């Protein structure tokens, strides 16, 4: 064939600057696109062989070679796939590939950065011009009698094609890198990108550096393969003083190691995978050497093809930020991390891989949001996670409880974000009580003397004509076992129980549960003084008790300079407690909501959010205040009792803590003087 020259299109002059702009953050995708093309060529070659349209050599093994050459500033991609004739180069490169790039541009031109294309797929061969000033193709088709073809283009606007000199079936693409992209001729940078996108492609991928000095290894002679390049045969004599026959060794050129695991774990049958396989794969992909708690192996062929593995990592419940990483693949080619349009938002705390060949990729993120197929994929993934959790709850309760503290934030978040998921797992929710035993919601209701949903429903059926309000069962909870230990001890002494809700998500979650279950009300242990903690006031003492209560209210309001302070006087069964602070559940929820929305600096008092002071009428210090209203130590004692009550309720502000410490020192010095005076009087 003679030399053929041509122009692609006048519009092409505008394509590449715009493409570079839009895929700037993923500037390295050209490697994925070119390797994917080579992978497709090998796959087609194998299919033609299976169909009897060609015959592969007996020792055929599909492979892709990537060769960096920093001296010549080039990057080569070589595959032994199907190859192309001159007509096919004309069709696929000059027409179809260019058309694909044009369509890519059309999709992109009206997109904002918030509505980017998923994975930038569809750019294909022309992604090479993002990094190269010149691109050359040398190819030879598998077809009998086909001539080799050499194609070259500078800048992607004009091309020249003539007969080439390639002798092996396949394609070689050479990129002459521009000055801004020379880093891709570095072996380490190329390896980084290949491992990012191509670690699990179904074809072996080898990376090498042009003109590099060969590396060698020594192996047993019996292990030499036909493909090995033997440099030297070595006879190793036994060491002095040792018996045995001489060992025959061979020095060979070091065997290349593929960067691609062509049979990743998610493509295998779950029954063929061991625990060690799953853990090893997790560590390899996520570079996390802590073991995951457990995992779910997804394997679906109908109505769509989806495979993958989702891992439940150990979550640190002390922090707000819970971030996982789910990698999305298409036929073992990496697309992107954490595509929230495909993967339900609450699953983003997990780690895993999902491979869905049927997923539309050459569309924008906004288009995916309204795609019915994508919705089905997300629903399926959510259902499989719920099924796994329910299965563990029913058949492996011991381990489920062991994992609960780590997985509960994820499950609660899932309930808040996905109503279907919440409905599926509602019976598998657990609550840890003060004895660190795990209860279901129904267990909690029964433990607090309430009726379960089934019992309530049965009563309503029996007396359907009478309309009555559903009785609510209070479920008490604590958020900080150390800070609220005073209340916990009082509860335990009276045989009361509470559940531990220590994670930041729990405030929203209990509101969600109250909306779902109208027979349940959650109340923090210090929201009020439970009746079981109070002693009854004798009838003959009630008048005096009320007078003392009024007097104490007046004294504390005056000393604390707070006329709005709510003071309640109770006879507590625990005589060791002088004062307590309580904040109604409604006020606390309002306070937490304000903090969540960045309104923490506002005065919560305007919403009735001030803590009430509870004084124990039977405590000596409280009695001292009543009996010595004008005493010199009354002000000191009142302020100290108030701060002690707050300390068991919440942390003091820096100013409050400073004043509290100063008063504590004053009390100790006063006690020291008193003891010293007594000693001297003896």
Question: What feature does the model see in each segment?
Answer:
Residues 1-185, 192, 199, 217, ...:
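GHKL (Bergerat-fold) ATPase N-terminal catalytic module, capturing the glycine-rich phosphate-binding loop
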Residues 71, 675-676:
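Generic N-terminal leader/processing signal
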Residues 117, 135-158, 178-181, 188-674:
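GHKL/Bergerat-fold ATPase module in large chromosome/replication-associated machines
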Residues 676-682:
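Positively charged, low-complexity/disordered segments
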